[in-house]
Amino acid sequence: MDAPAATAKAPALPQADRSQLHSLLFLLVPVAIVALLPLLPFVNNYIIAAVVRALIFITLGQAWNVVAGIGGQLSLGHGVFLGIGCYTTGILFNKYGIPPWIGMWAGVLISLVFAFVMGAMTLRMRGVFFALATVAVSLAMVQISRHFVDLTGGADGLALKFFGDSLWAMQSRTPAPFLYAGLVLVIIYYAISRWILASTFGLEMQAVRDDEVAAAAAGVAVFKTKITGFVVSAMMTAIAGTLYMQFYMAIDPEAAFGLSQAIQLQLPALMGGLGTAWGPIIGGAVMIFLSEVTNWGSTKLGIEGLDILVYGLMLLVVVLRAPKGVVGLLPKAMQRGVR
């Protein structure tokens, strides 16, 4: 006799739905933990500020991951768009009183135009030639920003006028508001990354990344795909640049356009896992944890530059032993949830 319908097992979720459920659960847990941090009595402003720094570099890693991880274009000069976001917001606020909420979109527009022009000149190059071309642009921007002293502050940089706790000026005496702003931006960028990976455009980007000739033969508009990904990534970087500027309250040419900054914003994606939505998030968390530990070790041991040494060693280990990043080291079942 057949079992009653009421006792029949529910049908299993399709693989795609289970993967989305895993991703949602993996996202909700850290989001809840971070959101509750300011409410915990044992969490001070130093810890919150460290988490904000992590969130900022996660967003920068997420932006770079679009062009380099998903699109396969190794831009080593992406700090240019961080600098554009920072300087545009700061100059408009200091000189004209335009709030960062509006200045941010001006930075996005300038980054869009600059990325289109820069991409048109460099994206027909491949591999190391493209990477070196982006480095050249970055180094040129360092010199340009030093030259216009009245506008950018020259080598000394640009410091924001401080208005205290002000939503209009996007400023606060405590880091907690930046924690929530950074968390929201990380979630938005995660959603954008997931959408790109699942879209036809994302598949075209990955096809170009894997084999440009084969992608072109399959009907993919290679150059259009590359420059679109480059522009989207640049705009995302500029928005993160506004958050960077408002949190740190100052910027200088090296911090904005320098090669060391450009490399640092790549580390979250490289350590976490290139081409995945979760990679920059995991990599950014690992980076800041290591940074805080090594800073403490540097103070205790009196060794300067310990954090740079640890970053270098970690990157070497990832390249040699885990080319897919931390995500690639996770068990197969967990990897489905963090792609």
Which residues does each PLM region occupy?
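Transmembrane alpha-helices and adjacent helix-loop boundaries
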Residues: M1-R339
